[in-house]
């Protein structure tokens, strides 16, 4: 898992060196279509990456975005109106029927369908109109690391091309170097705080809340800890009562309006 996590910079660099014209073409398609809304289709870590993408689309493009509830298509056969909708699926494997079948449904109903997927030979890749590879390489660890990070980047690329935002594109281009530096950072100071913990609260707000959700999942998956993520906007409404002396908090304080 650690090896795959620290390789994220290389994976992101590989992704950014590929498919530039395809992303530009997708951006032109998105700008030429008047979508009234967008929907994300994903599960687990990929759903957290989808929440990050949803923040970007709503904040920058002004379109309402919802995460498709699990089993709505596969079990309940709900008659959703899909025309003039953008449907984006995110998946490492591209195998889950709960992701593949909704994308087929949306495409058949006239929606624009995009798959951000690591396995480009998967059923999901074959089902979507637009398939954008993550270029994360094979992931051995059950806990997703490099595929999660490359999913975030792919989502940001989609929005950067849709908005045709040069500043965002420049920020994305700088990511491999920034990630490489982060991988070299000394995180040992956190060990004394986290090692004895049995419960952890993870806090984020706005664009960082999906990352807080993923961090909490990682604590559960890898360390069998009771970790829960909360928005910084809601932490005073109940969660604060759980905090006592010595209770560990992990806070993602990203620059911008949410940091205050």
Predicted feature descriptions by range:
Residues 1, 7, 48-53, 212-214, ...:
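Conserved phosphate/anionic-ligand binding catalytic regions in large, soluble enzymes, centered on
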Residues 1-36, 177-184:
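An N-terminal, well-structured beta->alpha segment
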Residues 18-24, 67-73, 114, 181-185, ...:
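Short gly/ser/thr-rich secondary-structure transition/capping motifs
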Residues 22-36, 81, 188-197, 243:
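Glycine-rich phosphate/diphosphate-binding loops that line cofactor/substrate pockets in enzymes
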Residues 33-177, 205, 240-260:
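Glycine-rich phosphate-binding loops that contact phosphosugars or nucleotide phosphates
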Residues 62, 195-258:
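Acidic catalytic cores of enzymes that act on phosphate-bearing nucleotides/polynucleotides
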Residues 172-193:
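Active-site/ligand-binding-proximal alpha/beta "capping" segment
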């Amino acid at each position: 898992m650690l090896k795959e996590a620290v390789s994220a910079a290389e994976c992101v660099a590989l992704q950014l060196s590929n498919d530039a014209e395809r992303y530009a073409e997708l951006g032109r398609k998105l700008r030429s279509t008047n979508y009234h809304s967008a929907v994300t289709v994903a599960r687990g870590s990929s759903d957290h990456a989808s929440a990050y993408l949803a923040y970007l689309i709503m904040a920058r493009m002004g379109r309402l975005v919802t995460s498709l509830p699990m089993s709505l298509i596969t079990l309940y056969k709900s008659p959703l109106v899909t025309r003039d909708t953008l449907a984006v699926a995110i998946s490492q494997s591209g195998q889950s029927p709960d992701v593949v079948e909704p994308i087929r449904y949306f495409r058949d109903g006239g929606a624009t369908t995009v798959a951000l997927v690591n396995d480009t030979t998967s059923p999901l890749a074959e089902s979507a109109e637009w398939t954008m590879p993550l270029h994360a390489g094979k992931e051995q660890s059950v806990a997703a690391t490099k595929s999660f990070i490359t999913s975030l980047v792919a989502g940001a690329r989609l929005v950067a091309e849709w908005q045709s935002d040069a500043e965002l594109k420049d920020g994305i281009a700088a990511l491999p170097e920034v990630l490489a530096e982060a991988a070299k950072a000394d995180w040992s100071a956190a060990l004394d705080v986290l090692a004895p913990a049995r419960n952890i609260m993870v806090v984020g707000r706005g664009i960082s809340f999906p990352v807080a959700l993923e961090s909490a999942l990682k604590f559960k998956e890898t360390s069998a800890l009771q970790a829960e993520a909360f928005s910084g906007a809601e932490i005073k409404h109940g969660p604060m009562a759980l905090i006592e002396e010595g209770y560990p908090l992990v806070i993602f304080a990203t620059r911008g309006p949410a940091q205050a």
